[in-house]
Amino acid sequence: MKKFLILQMRPEDEAAKSEFEALMRVGGLERNEVHRIRLEKEPIPVIDIHEYSAIIAGGSPFDISIPEEKKSPVQKRIEDFFIELFDLIVPIDFPFFGACSGNGHLGKYCGTTISNTYAEPIGNVDVTISDAGKKDPLLKDLPQTFTAWVGHKEACDHTPPGAELLISSKPCPVQMFRIKKNIYATQFHPEADANEFILRINVYRHYGYFSPGEAGELIHAIKDSKAPVSKEILRRFVKRYRSKKF
């Protein structure tokens, strides 16, 4: 059986390790079912997508929307990598799931603007499945409105051209979209729980997501929060593409 390729973009080892474990745990993946690549590490290896059953891309502290001259060489290298990756997967509709930063890379590639217009503070938000989303295999029969974990400085301004909007929210209209039949992206974090976000609050307290002095208050506000429905989306993606051949 082919493995899932998990792409990560977090230079902070503690956050990267925790995210990787969360993706496996929520997705129901065993360690021998995945190939992990940390894209911020040099060099990025050559990837043959046909060696994998699907690709999952996680989050990142890098901001796609900042001016090019302010981007580090590492960030530029990652952005160039995703352009090359999408040049491969989009034409053949290869299974892909991008969460948060993965969402931004796919949205930009497909032609929408990424900006801070629909930034969301760290915490839970109510999201709503669209009429099109109700028919999607990853969302069918889920509650129409449910809670999801968010925390981002930028997002898609609009649904990318040619994409199907699957989930939206009042603070951020583009919470999940699909390209063709097998390429997905979410602005929210389906892998996350309160412990995961508490760790990220501590790791990223000086990264501009919130005032550093607010960390304790944020942790207190989210420590008992849960978002079980959003996890089902990642589980369904793994289940759907675990045995399919492309």
PLM regions: where:
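Flexible gly/pro-rich beta->alpha loop and the following alpha-helix that scaffold active-site loops
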Residues: 32-97
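Glycine/Thr-rich phosphate-binding loops of Rossmann-like dinucleotide-binding domains
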Residues: 14, 64-66, 107
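Short, charged N-terminal beta->alpha structural module
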Residues: 3-29
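A phosphate-binding catalytic loop at a beta-strand-loop-alpha-helix junction
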Residues: 96-105
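Cofactor-binding loop segments of dinucleotide-utilizing enzymes, especially the Rossmann-like FAD-
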Residues: 9, 39, 101
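Amide-donor transfer/coupling interface in amidating biosynthetic enzymes
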Residues: 6, 51, 91, 130-246
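Ligand/cofactor pocket segment of small-molecule handling proteins
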Residues: 104-105, 109-149
